[in-house]
């Protein structure tokens, strides 16, 4: 298993058809998408956070999450992941679905500001975790609002920083 991970090769990605200017940025929740999917107050607050590192309120984070989710669903995403790059040179992710079972045979669609901003994944499967005590394996991922979210296949990738008990 470790050998397979170490010897893993990059996935070949086929370039889309047409001119790059026709598809450039279409799967990125950049400023143009933000302007379209966020109300003016939320858009201005997010730009202030991106440009000046101003903290977001819970209300604004909820509004950003709603707009980002709507954009992602309209672009074919059905899952989201907090995506980060550990010091191993690869990438790591924690996947979740926009729809969760409600316990009554249906589903709830949820993606709140709380889910966007911070997650508490079990880091025991990450390079810092496997041989640690459980409490030491805990890790946190926090959204990086200055890096735009993007879609790969059917997954919304939310750029994050990952922090673990051991660094």
Describe the residue ranges of each PLM region:
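Divalent-metal coordination cores built from histidine and acidic residues
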Residues: 1-27
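ATP-dependent carboxylate/acyl-activation modules
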Residues: 137, 145-167
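Active-site core of metal-dependent hydrolases
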Residues: 22-146
């Amino acid at each position: 298993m470790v050998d397979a991970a170490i010897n893993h090769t990059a996935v070949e990605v086929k370039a889309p058809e047409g001119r790059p200017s026709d598809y450039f940025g279409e799967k990125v929740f950049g400023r143009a998408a933000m302007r379209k999917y966020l109300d003016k107050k939320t858009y201005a607050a997010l730009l202030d956070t991106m440009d000046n590192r101003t903290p977001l309120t819970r209300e604004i984070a909820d509004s950003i999450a709603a707009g980002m989710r709507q954009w992602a669903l309209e672009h074919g995403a059905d899952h989201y992941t907090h995506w980060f790059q550990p010091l191993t040179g690869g990438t790591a992710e924690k996947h979740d679905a926009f729809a969760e079972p409600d316990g009554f045979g249906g589903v709830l669609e949820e993606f709140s500001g709380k889910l966007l901003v911070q997650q508490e994944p079990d880091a025991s499967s990450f390079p810092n975790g496997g041989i640690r005590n459980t409490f030491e394996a805990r890790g946190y991922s926090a959204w990086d609002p200055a890096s735009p979210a993007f879609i790969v296949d059917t997954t919304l990738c939310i750029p994050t920083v990952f922090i673990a008990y051991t660094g």
